[in-house]
């Protein structure tokens, strides 16, 4: 009887530790979903002042005034935290295939990376456009969500959506690559291409001295056949995004719910054993 009680105690303790972590992630996920819904309802584009800030930033990028800095380097100065955008969320990154939805900030400061993904200093803002390349950095995982944990699972053709202002920009993954943390020429714009690059640490364990890149492109073709095919893809992509917009939680929430049911069941069985043990002692 005592061995059974000890066994149930071990199972409960072993279950409780990851369950608390998953519960924290689920709560964060629900909060982010409502924050996203609030953003969609209130977002009305950028003000004239913000448009001027955007133009000033893009001009600084084109002229090379802003240096590209590794957002995960321990020795870096936190210069990205100084942004004319302050703590304004400029948009949302959505990857339905990986169940990722993250707010986008300007400037990959520690504070911004704690809360979502951020535009790497020295790269374009994610508005799209030829000869532009926006790089969005995010942690491989964080205390409250998986963030870019599954980024290595992305495959060619997977869709990435950037909702910014009143605009939705759709990219399709072309390739992934792993570079050294100092190999920043890999993030330069590509002539006549509109590129979005997602960046995170690699491998999953220290010393994190490499970077995983996911490169996604927008396709531009003015031919009649291409325009027709592009419209079909656009409608399909829009349907995917609309479906994902309504999705509030990921599989982690369902796993957490199942875990709590299991926890209650084990606690009930343990309590029953303890009561039987007490009755046996009394007799």
Predicted feature descriptions by range:
Residues 278-283:
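Short, charged juxtamembrane terminal tails flanking transmembrane helices
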Residues 256-271:
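A cross-kingdom C-terminal cell-surface attachment/processing module
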Residues 3-155, 159-251, 268-276:
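Solvent-exposed, non-transmembrane regions of membrane-associated and secreted proteins
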């Amino acid at each position: 009887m005592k061995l059974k009680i000890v066994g149930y105690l071990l199972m409960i303790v072993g279950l409780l530790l990851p369950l608390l972590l998953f519960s924290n992630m689920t709560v964060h996920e629900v909060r982010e979903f409502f924050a996203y819904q609030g953003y969609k309802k209130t977002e009305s584009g950028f003000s004239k002042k913000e448009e001027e800030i955007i133009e000033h930033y893009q001009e600084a990028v084109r002229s090379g005034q802003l240096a590209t800095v590794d957002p995960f380097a321990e020795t870096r100065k936190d210069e990205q935290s100084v942004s004319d955008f302050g703590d304004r969320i400029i948009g949302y990154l959505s990857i339905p295939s990986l169940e990722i939805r993250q707010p986008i900030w300007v400037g990959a400061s520690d504070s911004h990376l704690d809360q979502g993904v951020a535009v790497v200093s020295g790269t374009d803002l994610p508005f799209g456009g030829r000869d532009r390349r926006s790089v969005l950095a995010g942690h491989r995982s964080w205390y409250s969500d998986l963030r870019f944990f599954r980024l290595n699972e992305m495959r060619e053709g997977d869709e990435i959506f950037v909702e910014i202002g009143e605009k939705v920009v759709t990219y399709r993954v072309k390739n992934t690559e792993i570079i050294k943390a100092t190999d920043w020429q890999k993030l330069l714009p590509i002539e006549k291409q509109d590129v979005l690059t997602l960046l995170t640490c690699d491998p999953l364990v220290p010393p994190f001295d490499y970077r995983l890149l996911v490169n996604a492109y927008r396709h531009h073709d003015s031919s009649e056949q291409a325009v027709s095919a592009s419209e079909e893809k656009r409608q399909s992509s829009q349907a995917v995004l609309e479906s994902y917009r309504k999705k509030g939680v990921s599989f982690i929430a369902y796993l957490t719910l199942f875990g709590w049911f299991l926890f209650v069941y084990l606690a009930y069985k343990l309590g029953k054993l303890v009561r039987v043990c007490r009755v046996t002692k009394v007799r």
